[in-house]
């Protein structure tokens, strides 16, 4: 539990195909929970209208970059916070466009929960397309993200059948049933266990733009009777996305007493502050005043060390951060000629339990390989927040 909150912390990633309504749903959910003031929403609506994207007002709350707003797509992972009755959430809005899959992996690797979005409009077929490299057919990002979420070890998922208000869906049960059945079948095909999909994965009909079934049960879908989910030995009934987040989701066991480990997902130079490193604490506790090193960038001959000056969560300073907390650290004393890199693991300088190795055993899954794999084949390898080039040697 973070020092500035009485509620335990969970991270949720919102993922799925481009234009499935991820940012809009996220912005609307935070607005409904009181995290987006009316005055700011009015400004976002005006900006969206100016760019000819009137329906993007809620999305603009998450998409802050100029290019994101002009293109109408999420490029980088954006984080915001909100609170349910039980939990303190960090919400990670991941990019859906295939050009930014590396950013999506970085965001999803920090999540405890995933909301996988699929549009109920005409883009549904594209969103879950198998793809075929030889035929030049592109794999749908909802399909690819569903596979990646499984590989990255996210154990709690929910399917959001979004845009139920569109003309194609018309809030009809037949469209929801069609998409729900297709999604369940697809999840099994990309690696999820059938029993888990049937019993532990709610499929929720929603409209992020209109707010249907986000906090309150929709009056536009009177046929919707909710979903019964098995959580351990319990059976939980959920009617809305809020129910899923508050009632269904659980905080995983956190290794608080283990040696501190924090993969670095972002490095920033903030005017008036200095070097700020972002990441998610995986184990142990991060506290100000501690000397740290960044592996594998740090070596005896070329040190990469610093001292934690402050710890912040969502722009608020805290006394410490526990496992599962997404934080920004102001680090003093970094060598400008050997700065930490994204993917480095931060450990305490006094901790000698983590070293470098020349080999390790890993479970590997290959995604989207157009041809056969031969000696010399090069690819990108993703591990936690690190994305590095690799080559097949034998």
Residue ranges of predicted features:
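P-loop NTPase switch module centered on the Walker A-proximal segment
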Residues: 2-102, 111-124, 128-133
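Residue-level "contact hotspot" at macromolecular interaction interfaces
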Residues: 17, 68, 107-110, 285, ...
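Residue-level signature of catalytic and energy-coupling elements of molecular machines
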Residues: 19, 25, 44, 72, ...
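Alpha-helical scaffold elements adjacent to nucleotide-binding pockets in ATP/GTP-utilizing enzyme cores
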Residues: 25-29, 40-43, 103, 144-148, ...
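Long insertion/accessory domains within large nucleic-acid-processing enzymes
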Residues: 95, 381-394
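Conserved nucleotide-binding/hydrolysis micro-motifs of P-loop NTPases
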Residues: 97-98, 120-124, 154, 163-168, ...
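Conserved C-terminal guanine-recognition region of P-loop GTPase G domains, centered on the G4
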Residues: 107-108, 114, 118-200
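Conserved catalytic-core segments of large NTP-driven translation/proteostasis enzymes
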Residues: 177-370
């Amino acid at each position: 539990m973070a020092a500035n909150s009485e509620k335990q912390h969970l991270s949720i990633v919102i993922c799925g195909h481009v234009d499935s309504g991820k940012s809009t749903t996220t912005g609307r959910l935070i607005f409904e929970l009181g995290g987006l003031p009316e005055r700011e929403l009015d400004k976002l609506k005006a900006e969206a209208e100016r760019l000819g994207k009137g329906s993007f007002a809620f999305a603009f709350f998450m998409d802050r970059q100029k290019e994101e707003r002009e293109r109408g797509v999420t490029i980088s992972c954006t984080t915001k916070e909100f609170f349910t009755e039980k939990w303190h959430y960090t919400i990670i809005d991941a990019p859906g466009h295939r050009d930014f899959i590396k950013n999506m992996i970085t965001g999803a690797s920090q999540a405890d929960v995933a909301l996988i979005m699929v549009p109920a409009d005409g883009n549904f077929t594209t969103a879950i397309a198998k793809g075929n490299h030889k035929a030049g057919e592109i794999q749908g990002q909802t399909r690819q993200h569903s596979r990646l979420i499984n590989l990255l070890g996210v154990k709690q998922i929910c399917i959001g059948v979004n845009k139920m208000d569109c003309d194609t869906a018309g809030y009809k049960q037949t469209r929801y049933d069609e998409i729900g059945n297709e999604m369940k079948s697809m999840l099994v095909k990309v690696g999820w266990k059938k029993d888990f999909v049937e019993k532990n994965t709610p499929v929720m009909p929603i409209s992020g733009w209109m707010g249907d079934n986000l906090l309150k049960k929709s009056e536009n879908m009177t046929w919707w009777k909710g979903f019964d989910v098995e959580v351990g030995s319990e059976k939980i009934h959920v009617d809305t996305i809020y129910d899923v987040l508050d009632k269904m989701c659980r905080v995983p066991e956190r290794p608080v007493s283990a040696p501190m480990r924090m993969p670095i997902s972002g490095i920033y130079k903030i005017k008036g502050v200095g070097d700020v490193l972002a990441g998610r604490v995986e184990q142990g506790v991060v506290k100000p005043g501690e000397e740290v090193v960044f592996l594998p960038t740090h070596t005896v001959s070329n040190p990469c060390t610093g001292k934690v000056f402050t710890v912040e969560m969502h722009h608020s300073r805290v006394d410490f951060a526990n496992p599962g907390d997404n934080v920004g650290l102001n680090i003093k004393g970094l060598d400008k000629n050997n700065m930490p890199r994204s993917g480095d693991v931060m450990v305490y300088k006094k901790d000698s339990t983590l070293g470098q190795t020349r080999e390790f055993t890993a479970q590997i899954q290959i995604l989207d390989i157009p041809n056969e794999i031969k000696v010399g084949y090069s690819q990108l390898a993703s591990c936690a927040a690190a994305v590095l080039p690799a080559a097949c040697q034998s």
